[in-house]
Structures are given as structure tokens and as C-alpha cells.
């Protein structure tokens, strides 16, 4: 039986050092993915690394999460992105399955309709950040990382931070 070092060496020979680092980073993120999926009571999703313009993205139909390489290699940023995308997956499943006990269901539907009409991308505008599905995802990301891992996160904009705090106070 081959040792981990031998297997790692073969992997590096076949795919390169950079791909090895990415795979190691993804392996380290598996427990986080599992934990947030269990918390939200949604299926666990595969996570891959692709060259995308935004930090992360979720593919609802295909059911997987994409991280940009630099995000995947930064554990805190990867954790934030994974939790954020899982919250979007939860929102999507609430709408798809008509989970009426979710108090924000109607707002989720409106947010997804906006994304369909305007494209599912972070364009850096106030319109994007003011969508309830984005406020909810950023607030959940902040709440979950603090409650489960003791990690405090902040948004660069102090006013947006206050909005997230108020949202957490009202909904979590």
C-alpha cells in the first residue's frame, strides 16, 4: 500500500504543484460544506475551482458550487463563499419546494426573479447588494461563521454591516 506522501508525489507529477494545492484546499473545505449543508438541511454539493470573475457561484440546475482559485486557496474567504452559496441553494430549494414556513419565501422569489431578468452576477451595484436574497446570504454567512466557528466577519461598508446585524437580529 502506498503512503500518502507517495500518492501526493504521484499527483504532483501528474497534475502539478498548483493543482495539488487546490485539491488540498478543497479537501480541507469538505467538513465546512458538510456542516453548513446539515445545518440548512439541504443536500451537500460538490465544490470545484474554475476561472470565474466573481468570488463564487452556484449552479442550481447542475447542483454544484464554483470557487475562483484565489478564493479556494484562502480558507477564510472560501468558508465565507461556501456558506453564502449554500444559503442561496437553501433559498432556491425553499421556492422550488414551496417551503411556506420560511418567512422570507416571497422575498426569495422576488430576488430570484430579479436575477433571472438581470443576470445572476454581482455587478457591484447597490441594486445587487440590496436584494433580499443577497442580504440574507451575507447575513447568514456572518451568523453561521460566528455561531459555529467563532469567526467574526465584516463587510467593508460599515452601513451594510449594520443592515446585516439588524437582519440577523430579526431573522436568526
Please report, for each region that a protein language model flagged, where it lies by residue.
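Auxiliary, metal-adjacent structural segments of Zn-dependent hydrolase domains
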Residues: 2-61
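N-terminal low-structure segments adjacent to metalloprotease catalytic domains
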Residues: 1-2, 91
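Surface-exposed helix-capping loop/turn segments at secondary-structure junctions
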Residues: 37-44, 96-98, 148-155
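Short, function-defining helix-loop hinge/capping sites that tune catalysis or transport
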Residues: 92-96, 142
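Metalloprotease/metallohydrolase-associated module, dominated by Zn2+-dependent proteases
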Residues: 100-172
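Active-site oxyanion-binding pockets that recognize sulfate/phosphate
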Residues: 19, 72, 76, 127
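Active-site scaffold of zinc-dependent metalloenzymes
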Residues: 42-77, 86-93
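A structural signal for well-ordered alpha-helical segments within the folded catalytic domains
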Residues: 27, 76, 80, 84, ...
